[in-house]
Amino acid sequence: MGMMDGKVALISGGAEGIGGTAGQRFVEEGGSVMLGDIQLEKAQAHAASLGERAAAVELDVRNLDQWEAAVAATKEKFGKLTTLFNVAGISEPGPVDTVDLESWNRTIDINLHGTFNGCRVGLPAILESGEDGAIVNIGSMLAMRPGSQFAAYSASKAAVTALSKSLALHCAAQNYPVRVNTVHPGAIDTPMYQRYLAAYPGSHEEAVEVFNRNHPIKRVGLAREVADAMLWLASDASSFTTANDITVDGGGSYRE
């Protein structure tokens, strides 16, 4: 038996990176997944690689109608929804005084409003299942330790953290059997991280060496390490855990 036996997840940003790996791990542990992503063809290919207990749907998290359609597709395909992973997000650099306003609005819209939309539409569907459910939102170590060059991203992820706690307390007050928690990744080897390395003025190898040298455990994190924290929060093993934060950053938040 796997830790996700009988559970059904909808994952935003499910085509690749942390979301894609979370989908893979969810299926490996016995669950079923609907991979929602704006990159539909990539999500479909990933779902096909995972077998019969995976499917894909187009999902722009800014679009409430697409969220409604994604939840409906999940219920039609797998009969219910028990788990929501809000993973989709973007990160664009810029300090407060010079950040492009379109970039600011886009980051807040996708990272914060997208997560809100998922919670708003996903919660009633999870309650409808009649089973214990879980919502796991993706924050960032920059929600705890903001970066001066990432004003919009830091602010959006701090807001996601507060949103998660607010929803968790609401569910508890209403006796809803749904737990809500946040996972905060540090630097994780994903397409987003590779874009950071590509922007480094030196070579790729130099960028990796500089990062590893300055990191407490001398390496970048793996998407699976974040996904496994997400699965634990979605499993019955964490039944007394809600309104909490798990940071998966190899100690990066506290480096000297």
Give the positions of each predicted feature.
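Short C-terminal tail/terminal secondary-structure segment
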Residues: 3, 145, 230-231, 242-256
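Canonical Rossmann dinucleotide-binding motif of NAD(H)/NADP(H)-dependent dehydrogenases/reductases
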Residues: 3-34
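Alpha-helical segment proximal to the catalytic Tyr-Lys
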Residues: 124, 169-173, 239
